[in-house]
Amino acid sequence: MNKKIAVKILLYLLSLSVYTASVAQVAQLDNLAIVTGAQTLSNGEKAAIKILTEEIEKRTGLHCTSSATFPATGNVIIIKKSGDKLKTSFAFDNLKNLILKPESFRIAVNNDKSRTIILIEGTDSRGVFFGAGKLLRLFSYSKKSVSIPVSLSLSTSPDKPIRGHQLGFRNTANSYDAWTPEQFDQYIRELAIFGSNSIESIPIFDEKQSPHFKIAPDEMNKRISEICQDYDLDYWMWVPAQLDLNDKDKRNRYLSTFEKICGYSARINGVFFPGGDPGNNPPELVIPLLEEMAVILKKYHPKAFIWLSLQNFDAAQSQFVYRYIREKMPIWLGGLVVGPSSPPAAETRAALPRKYQLRQYPDLTHNVRCDSPVPWWDPAFNFTLGREAINPEPNYFAAIYHALDQYIDGFISYSDGIHDDVNKITWTELSWNRNENIGDITREYSNFFFGKAVTDDAADGILALEKNWEGPIAANGSIQSTLVLWQSLEKNHPELASNWRWQMCLLRANYDAYVRKRYIYETGLEEQANIILAAADTVGADKAMAQALEILNRAETDKISPALREKIISLCEALYQSIGLQTSVAKYKASGEERGAVMDFIDRPLNNRWWLEDEFKRIKLLPEKEQASALKSIGNWENPGPGGFYDNVGNISKSSHVLKGQSWMVKPLQVDDEGPGFDWWDNGFSRKRLSWMINMRWPPGVEYTGLDSTAQYTVRVTGYGECLLKANDQRLSPSKYGKGVGEIKEFPVPKSLIHNGKLLLTWDDLNEDFLNWRQQSRVNEVWLIKNL
C-alpha cells in the first residue's frame, strides 16, 4: 500500500467513533402532509411518498396525508425534483445549493409562523427517494409525532454510482431462503433508505431446493425485480456457469435459462458473470458466451450491460481479458468486477480503459476462510461462532473501503444472510459519503431501527461487539462489559424484544460472553488434567487417565453459566421466528454447519478433551511400560522445558513470539501479511488437537531474545507438508521431518547462529500454487527447546 493511502486510512481511523453533538432547537411535529411538486409522479417519487408515510406511521402511529396541493395549515414535507413548480409563496431562507449530479438531493427545514416546512428536492426522481430516506434517518420518533432540528439544511450527492447488495434466494443463504416477498420488499426498502441503489439476485444456481422456500425461486426472483422497479432501484443478476462450456448441450441449456430469466424480469440493469468461484472455464470460452448472452439481454433490456470478474483466473488469463477489452472495446460490457480471488483492484483499474467501470464485490459476510478474515481472531470464536456468525465490524470494513476507494466506481456486496446487516449499511453510507464518521453511521442505524431512547447506547453497543473480537479472549474483559450493556438495554426496552436486529446484537453479546467463560473454565480443566498426566509414572497410567477424564468431563457434568447458555438458545429461536435465521442444522435446517449454525457449536470443547479421549484409547493398547511415557508426553505437550518457549503460531492467545505484521488499521487488505488460518475438518467437529487446526502458511517471523548464547537449542515444529526453516537468515537442516498433521519436525540450531542472545526464525516461501489450498504446506506450532 502506498503512503498516500496509508495516511488517508490513519487520518480516517482517528475520527472513528468520534461524535460531536450540536445543541439545536427541535421541531416536534404531530401532524404532517406530504406535498408533491409534480402532477405525474415517477416510481422514485411514488416510492418516496410510500416510505415516508409507512415508516413514520409504523414507528409513531402518525398518519401522513399526501397531495399535490399545498395546505393552508399544518406541517408539510415538500418532495420535488429540481425544476418542478409549487403553488406556494413560501420561500426557504437557508437552502444550500443543489449539487447537479445524478441522485443528489438537498433537505431544508424552515418555520413559517406556527408550522414547520421541510423540503426534499432531488436532481432526479432517485434524488427525491434518497432524500426521503435521509429524512427518515434524521427524524427522531415518538408516539404520534416526529422531531427534527428546525435549522437543518444539507445538500449531498453520492460518491459512487453503484451501491448495492447481493440477496440470493437460495438454499445456501442462512436466512433469505426463509423469506416471503413482503420480507424482501421491506429489507430492500431499508437498504435503499440508507442509500443503496442496486440489488443483485441469484436466479441461476446449482444446488438443492431449500426446505424453507415459501414460493418457487423463479417466482421470487421475478418479485425481487418488480420490487426494484417499484423503488426505482437497479436490478442485477449473478449468473455463474457451473458447467463445462465445451459441452454444447449444457451451454445451450444455460443460455435458454438465461433468456427465460431475462423475459420474466421487470427490469435488469446489470448481469454479473463470475470468471470463477464458482466456475472453472478459461476466458477463451467465457467471452464468446458473454457475447451471446449480451444479444439475449439487449433483446429484453436494451440498456443493460454484462459485467465480468476475473476470479480464479491466473495472470495469463487475466491478461487475455484485458487485451480483449482494449482491442475490441465491447459495447455490451459495463465493466469488470473485483472480488475474492481476483487480481488486485489497482492492477485491474490500470489495465481497464476509463470508459469501463470497476465494481467491487466485497465479502461482508464471512469471518474466516474468506477475502477479509477477522484479523487475528481468537480460535475460541472460530471454533464456535465460525464463518458466518453475526458480525458487525464497521471500523474494520470502513478501513477496507478506504483502501479500495480510489480504484472502484462502486460495489455490490456478497452477502448470504442478515447477519452482516451493519456491514452492509456501513459500506452503503461510505459509498455515498467517504468521509462519513463511523460513530454517526452507527447512530443513524440505531436511531432508525431501535429508536431515539437507545440511539447512543445501542450505537456504543454495536461498536463494543466489534471490540469483543480484538485480542486474546481471556484477556478481553470488555466482553463482559459489553454483555452488561446489552443486558441493561434489553431490560429497559422490552418493546424491542421482537426486533430482529436487536435480537442479533443480544445474541452476539451473550454468545461472546459465554464462549469467554467456557474458554477460561475449560482451559483451566485441561491444565489440571495435564498436571496429572505429566505425573503418570508416579500416579500410574490407568489412574492418571481416569482422573484426567473426570476433570475434563466437568465441562459437561458441571457446565459453567447455564443461564447464559439457555439465553443463547432462546435468542436463536427468536431469530428463527422473526427473520428466519437458521442457527442450527438439526433444529432449523441450516444448509450446513459453516452457514451460521452457531447453536450447534454451543458445547463444542474449547480445550483438547476430544483429542485426549481418543489418545487415551490409543495409549491403553500400548505395552504397559510405554503408557506412562506417552501420557507424560501429552501432559507436557506445550511445555518446552526450562529455558524454552512454545507458540501456537496462529493463536493470538498463545503466540507471544510470533511477529504479527502490520495492523489492519494500517494495512486493512492484509496483502502479503497473511494472518492465521483455521482448517475446517469434519464439518467443524474434528476431534484433532485444536492447535493443529490453527495455522499460518509461513509466519512473518518467530523472534526470541535473552537466549543463552552458549547453549544448544532445537526448533521443533508441527504443521503440514514442507518447512523451509531459517534461523537468523541461515537455512536449517532437519534431524526429524514428519510431514503429516501433528507429526514432528526438528531442526538443531548451531550455537554460532545465536548472536547476543537473539534468534529470528523465518521461512523461505514455496510455490505450491498447483495444489488446492487445503493441501498446501503450513505451520501450526513452534517450540524452541534448550537442550540440557
Question: How would you label these PLM feature ranges?
Answer:
Residues 625-707, 772-788:
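Glycan-recognition and processing domains
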Residues 142-144, 197, 209-225, 229-230, ...:
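Catalytic-core regions of glycoside hydrolase
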Residues 691-710, 718-787:
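Beta-strand-rich ligand-recognition modules
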Residues 2-4, 48-49, 134, 179, ...:
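Composition- and surface-driven signal marking solvent-exposed, interaction-prone regions
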